[in-house]
C-alpha cells in the first residue's frame, strides 16, 4: 500500500454526496440537531477519497466533508477499465467483495460502493456487499479493499521475478 500523500489541487475532483444524516444531542432543554454529511471525491482516473463533516447547517457539513475527503485520497491501481485482481475489503462488520469484470460489464455495485467505484474511474467491476450495509462502513471497506490492490508488475518486482514468471 502506497502511503504517499496525493495533492488534491493537481487533480480535477468530482464530488458525490452519499448521505446527509440529522443527528441529535439530547440536552436538558430538549434536542440539539446537527447534520452529518458523507461525501466521496474522485477524478475518475484512479484517485478516490471519502470524508465526513458535521455542522449545524447542511451546506457547511458538506463543505467540511469535501475538505476531509480531499485529505484522504488514495490511488487505485487499474488494468484497463477494471481492477487487477479479486479482493475482499473489510471494515467493522462490513465486507465488500470486489471482482474484476470483462469490458462492457459496467459497475455492478449498490449505493455507496457504486459512488466510490465510479469516482475512482473503475468502469467494469462486480461487487457484493456482505455483512453491515451502513453507508460509512461500506465506503470504508471499499476504500480499504481498493488500497490493497497490487498490479502484477509491482508484485513481480517485490518478489524479484519477471511478470511472465509470476503469471506462469
Swiss-Prot record:
Signal peptide: none annotated. Residues 13-76 form the S5 DRBM domain. Pfam families: Ribosomal_S5, Ribosomal_S5_C. Keywords: Ribonucleoprotein, Ribosomal protein, RNA-binding, rRNA-binding. InterPro entries: Ribosomal_Su5_D2-typ_SF, Ribosomal_uS5, Ribosomal_uS5_bac-type, Ribosomal_uS5_C, Ribosomal_uS5_N, Ribosomal_uS5_N_CS, Ribsml_uS5_D2-typ_fold_subgr. Transmembrane segments: none annotated. GO terms for molecular function: rRNA binding; structural constituent of ribosome. One of its GO terms (biological process) is translation. GO terms for cellular component: small ribosomal subunit. The keyword Iron-sulfur does not apply. The N-terminal domain interacts with the head of the 30S subunit; the C-terminal domain interacts with the body and contacts protein S4. The interaction surface between S4 and S5 is involved in control of translational fidelity. HAMAP family: Ribosomal_uS5_B. Belongs to the universal ribosomal protein uS5 family. With S4 and S12 plays an important role in translational accuracy. Part of the 30S ribosomal subunit. Contacts proteins S4 and S8. This is Small ribosomal subunit protein uS5. It comes from Bacillus licheniformis (strain ATCC 14580 / DSM 13 / JCM 2505 / CCUG 7422 / NBRC 12200 / NCIMB 9375 / NCTC 10341 / NRRL NRS-1264 / Gibson 46).
